[in-house]
């Protein structure tokens, strides 16, 4: 993640848990939001603007959290 700059952090509460959302800017003027569940489990949402990246991420975060709570047996397998 060279040349990206952290521009904002906020905490989103969902079902009694707090999740950190970090928003970064890129040199080309675009942005992305990131939440790390673990070092190997990260979701990223891209956007042309700060607001677009953050809104997309906030919309997707509940789905990402819920999908991680699904039993492995009910998940699709390749």
Segments from the language model and where they lie:
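A short, structured beta-strand/loop element
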Residues: 19-44
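Short N-terminal "domain-start" leader segments
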Residues: 1-27
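Mixed-charge, Lys/Arg-enriched low-complexity segments
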Residues: 1-2, 40-78
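Generic alpha-helical secondary structure signal
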Residues: 12, 23, 35-36, 54, ...
